[in-house]
């Protein structure tokens, strides 16, 4: 198997983009909001609607003594959120394909959970249209993002 090596799309690549992936860190949010599974469920439903996505399934889990994880399966892909109320922090992952608006959905989550600080990375998801299907078999291309 090949070694891990960074991969970045270059301007010369002809990427067929199939979606947009936001990887989010948010902090300075109130502990009570981040530990409220029903509030997080409502925030996700509002975010999905605002992002013009279609909800298929929603799973929310309350951890003990604190923390919530919620995953929403969308017709357009998914949203996942994990909270650490004791740190006023949540991590979210929004992957939308098609015409959905993940940035709008993220802003709704930020507002609903009252995070004062948010940082996200937008990653276009897709493949090189010029590559042969088996061109890179056995040679994984990964990027470790720190």
Language-model-detected regions and their locations in the chain:
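Polybasic/polar functional segments that serve as interface/processing modules
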Residues: 2-146
């Amino acid at each position: 198997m090949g070694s891990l090596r960074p991969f970045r799309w270059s301007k010369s690549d002809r990427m067929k983009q199939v979606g947009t992936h936001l990887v989010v860190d948010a902090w300075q949010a109130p502990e009570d909001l981040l530990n409220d599974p029903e509030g997080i469920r409502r925030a996700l439903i509002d975010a999905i609607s605002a992002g013009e996505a279609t909800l298929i399934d929603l799973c929310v889990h309350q951890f003990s003594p604190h923390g919530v994880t919620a995953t929403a399966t969308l017709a357009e892909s998914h949203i996942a959120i994990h909270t650490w109320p004791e740190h006023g922090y949540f991590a979210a992952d929004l992957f939308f394909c098609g015409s959905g608006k993940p940035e709008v959905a993220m802003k709704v989550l930020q507002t609903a959970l009252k995070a004062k600080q948010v940082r996200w990375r937008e990653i276009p998801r897709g493949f090189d249209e010029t590559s042969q299907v088996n061109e890179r078999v056995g040679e994984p291309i990964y990027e470790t993002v720190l």
